[in-house]
Structure formats: structure tokens, C-alpha cells
């Protein structure tokens, strides 16, 4: 049985948009107003502030990790099922993509998804991270690296995740991330997608 409070807390944690928070801290423009308009680390990097981009990446990944780890630590005391943990994982990503604190205008979810996967299955997260790194360094296109790693996630989950509900959650997470990258997919097909760090 899903625990509604646990899912709600996870959604609220996911709703913390570190791209906006970090940018505001450094006196930068709201990342939703320049570049791709996406409040994520890649777009923050376009501002030229590498430290802000790194902090955004770490913050977005950490919130996914913390939301799911918190639920796993409290799983027995709260009587949370494995399916409830899967729902918590999804809620963190949904919060990032449609954050209640920022007008439901969120990011594409790559870093948060990685944090969620790290909490569910470190091996799955490691596979995805390695694929992202290879693709990013090889092609210098963030979205291509993200899409490749995203597609690999459910396949890796089949081998490394212990619960079927978590595998299904990983598949849904991958589909959500792919959905949020639909404009990037279109640009890739047209050969118009920008390189990492390139200003628009």
C-alpha cells in the first residue's frame, strides 16, 4: 500500500529547484529565462559560472538520493512496501519536473533520476553514469549522453534491482526523462543540438 505522506514529502523534496536556488544565491539570472530555458546544470553552465553548474548538478542529484534513502531507512518503522519505495522514487522526479515551489516549471530530471537510482541500486546508477560520461566526453552533447544513459537505465535495472516494482519505476522514470527531452530529440535529428558549455 502506498504511503501518501511519504510520497508527498518526496515530491516536495524533489520540488526544490537547485538551478534556480543556486542562481539566485550567486546573483545570476533565472536559468528559465536564458539558453534552453531549462532549470538544470547544463543550462546553468551556459551562464559561464561553472561552480554554479556543479552545485546545481550535485543539489539535484542529492535531493533524489535523499528522498529515496529517507524512505528506505524508514521503510520498516513506517511499514512501507517495496511498491511504496518505487512510488517515492517517482514522486521525487515528478517534483523536479513539475515543482510546486516554482510554478510547476522544472527541469528534465537527469541528475535527479541519477540520485534516485543511486538510492535504489548503486550498480544501476554506476552503469548509467559511466555511459553518460563516455557519451559526453565522446560527443560533447549533453542531451545525447543523457538520452543514451536513460535508455540504458531500465536494462541495467533488470540485472541489478531486487524488486519488480523498482524496475517498473525505473522504466517510468526513463520514459518521463525521455518525454522531457522531446525538443532535444528533435534537435538531434535535425543536427541542431548544442555542445556542452556552448552559449545559446
From Swiss-Prot:
Keywords: Cell inner membrane, Cell membrane, Lipid biosynthesis, Lipid metabolism, Membrane, Phospholipid biosynthesis, Phospholipid metabolism, Transferase, Transmembrane, Transmembrane helix. The chain crosses the membrane at residues 2-22, 51-71, 84-104, 114-134, 159-179. It is an enzyme of class 2 (transferase). Pfam families: G3P_acyltransf (PF02660). It catalyses: an acyl phosphate + sn-glycerol 3-phosphate = a 1-acyl-sn-glycero-3-phosphate + phosphate. The keyword Zinc does not apply. GO terms for cellular component: plasma membrane. One of its GO terms (biological process) is phospholipid biosynthetic process. One of its GO terms (molecular function) is acyl-phosphate glycerol-3-phosphate acyltransferase activity. Its EC number is 2.3.1.275. Pathway: Lipid metabolism; phospholipid metabolism. It is a multi-pass membrane protein. It is found in: Cell inner membrane. Probably interacts with PlsX. Belongs to the PlsY family. This is Glycerol-3-phosphate acyltransferase. The gene is plsY.
Amino acid at each position: 500500500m502506498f504511503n501518501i505522506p511519504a510520497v508527498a514529502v518526496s515530491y516536495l523534496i524533489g520540488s526544490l529547484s537547485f538551478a534556480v536556488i543556486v542562481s539566485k544565491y550567486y546573483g545570476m539570472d533565472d536559468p528559465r529565462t536564458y539558453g534552453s530555458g531549462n532549470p538544470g546544470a547544463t543550462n546553468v553552465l551556459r551562464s559561464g559560472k561553472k561552480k554554479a553548474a556543479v552545485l546545481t548538478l550535485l543539489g539535484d542529484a542529492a535531493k533524489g538520493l535523499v528522498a529515496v534513502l529517507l524512505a528506505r531507512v524508514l521503510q520498516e518503522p513506517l511499514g512501507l512496501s517495496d511498491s511504496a519505495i518505487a512510488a517515492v522514487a517517482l514522486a521525487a522526479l515528478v517534483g523536479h519536473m513539475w515543482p510546486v515551489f516554482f510554478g510547476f516549471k522544472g527541469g528534465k530530471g537527469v541528475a535527479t533520476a541519477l540520485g534516485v537510482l543511486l538510492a535504489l541500486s548503486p550498480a544501476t546508477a554506476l552503469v548509467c553514469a559511466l555511459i553518460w560520461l563516455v557519451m559526453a566526453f565522446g560527443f560533447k552533447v549533453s542531451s545525447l549522453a543523457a538520452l543514451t544513459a536513460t535508455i540504458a537505465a531500465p536494462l541495467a535495472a533488470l540485472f541489478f534491482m531486487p524488486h519488480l516494482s523498482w524496475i517498473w519505476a525505473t522504466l517510468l522514470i526513463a520514459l518521463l526523462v525521455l518525454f522531457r527531452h522531446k525538443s532535444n530529440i528533435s534537435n538531434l535529428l535535425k543536427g541542431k543540438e548544442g555542445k556542452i558549455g556552448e552559449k545559446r
